[in-house]
Structure formats: C-alpha cells, structure tokens
Amino acid sequence: MSRVGKRPVAVPSGVTATVDGQTVKMKGPKGQLQFVVHDDVEVKLESGQIKVKPRLETNRARALYGTARAQVANLVEGVTKGFEKKLEITGVGYRAAMQGKNLQLALGYSHDVIYTIPEGITITVPKPTEITVTGSDIQRVGQVAAEIRSYRPPEPYKGKGVKYVGEFIFRKEGKKK
C-alpha cells in the first residue's frame, strides 16, 4: 500500500496557500489555482505545510487521501514551475503553425484543423513538427495535449500522426503478398 498521503506538502516561499474548508487555494508566480478536496479527506495548513489525512478509517477515505495529497502537491508545483507536454508530428506534409491565438494543424485532411487555445494554456511551435503545451494546471495541460493528439493519433503501420515525445508506438507488419 502506498504511503504518499502521509508526507506533508511543503509550501515554498513566494507561494501563498489558504485552506478554506475543503478548498485549497495556491497563489504563486505562475498564477493562481484551487482544488476542492473530497469530503472524506481532511486538509490542514500548519506552519508552512499542508497536511492531508482521512477523516474516517474507511477504505474509500484511505484510497482518496493519497490522491488528494498528490493533487495539492501538483498545485504547488504548478504555481511555481508549471507543467509542460511536448508533442511530435510525424508524416509527409503533416505540420503545425501558430495563427494568431489559434493552432493550425495540417494533418492530411482536406482542410486544416484549427485548434482554439484555451485560457491559461500557452502553446508554442518551435519547429513545424513540434508542439509544446505549457501551463500551471497539470490536468488542463494534459487535456489540451490529448485533444491535439486526438486529431490524428499515431497509426501502427508507419507511425504517422501526432504523438507525445518519448511515447512508444506499437508497430505492426504490413500484409505480405
């Protein structure tokens, strides 16, 4: 069984943390985030540390308090360092470009895919075949990266499509004559 929840989350200098009932709010150099903790989990702010523990000794509460602690730790990391996901585009004629506040993707369709960038997320295109998604909320960064990937997921025969950097694509052999 994991013991992640037992470790307190340190609040670094430059970050202000407030706990109001079940809501944990963080404010730092990269922005402001908040997270509502489940009712079965108790959250306390004590001497620059946030401590998470289950209210009851039920299996559900014990299962949730480690998750709640990890979510609070992600809030701290998000407002200090931020999060980043990198995507890679593979395929002939497949490319990405910024078009104002939108991301324009040429992915082999008869039309270009225009992705509107949500607020709080920054997308950069260092090369036409690379996309970098950054932001302070780990969930939103991952969601945006997954939405972009879903326009053309990598296929198993040639590996064409949009994939995460470092993602392994299971390759298949083509049919034989």
Swiss-Prot record:
Tagged with keyword RNA-binding: yes
Record Gene3D superfamilies: Ribosomal protein L6, alpha-beta domain
Chain ranges passing through the membrane: none
UniProt xrefs under HAMAP family: Ribosomal_uL6_B
GO term, biological process aspect, one: cytoplasmic translation
Known function: This protein binds to the 23S rRNA, and is important in its secondary structure. It is located near the subunit interface in the base of the L7/L12 stalk, and near the tRNA binding site of the peptidyltransferase center.
PROSITE patterns referenced in this protein's UniProt entry, alphabetically: RIBOSOMAL_L6_1 (PS00525)
InterPro entries xrefs: Ribosomal_uL6-like (IPR000702), Ribosomal_uL6-like_a/b-dom_sf (IPR036789), Ribosomal_uL6_a/b-dom (IPR020040), Ribosomal_uL6_bac-type (IPR019906), Ribosomal_uL6_CS (IPR002358)
A single cellular component GO annotation: cytosolic large ribosomal subunit
Organism: Bradyrhizobium diazoefficiens (strain JCM 10833 / BCRC 13528 / IAM 13628 / NBRC 14792 / USDA 110)
Coiled-coil ranges per UniProt: none
GO terms, molecular function: rRNA binding; structural constituent of ribosome
Family classification: Belongs to the universal ribosomal protein uL6 family.
Subunit structure as annotated in this protein's UniProt entry: Part of the 50S ribosomal subunit.
Short name of any one Pfam family annotated for the protein: Ribosomal_L6
Keywords: Ribonucleoprotein, Ribosomal protein, RNA-binding, rRNA-binding
Annotated protein name in UniProt: Large ribosomal subunit protein uL6
